[in-house]
Amino acid sequence: MSEKACRHCHYITSEDRCPVCGSRDLSEEWFDLVIIVDVENSEIAKKIGAKVPGKYAIRVR
């Protein structure tokens, strides 16, 4: 099963629906990723708007 990125929050998942925002608007065309471990203390998480720990795509088509 391929991983898809949510077009709204950029969370990467293998499910048919984004577990973070609930969107079904997912794409298999995403580029670069960042793994967020500590959402509250991560400057990158704040910059990309990450709400939960996990893998996030930098660019999603």
Curated annotation (Swiss-Prot):
Q: Which HAMAP family match?
A: Spt4_arch (MF_00949)
Gene name for this UniProt entry? spt4
- The entry's Zn(2+)-binding residues are C6, C9, C18, C21
Cite the SMART domains for this sequence.
Answer: Spt4
Q: Which GO terms describe its biological process?
A: regulation of DNA-templated transcription
Listed name of the protein: Transcription elongation factor Spt4
In alphabetical order, the GO MF annotations are: zinc ion binding
- UniProt organism field: Pyrococcus furiosus (strain ATCC 43587 / DSM 3638 / JCM 8422 / Vc1)
Quaternary structure, from the entry: Heterodimer composed of Spt4 and Spt5.
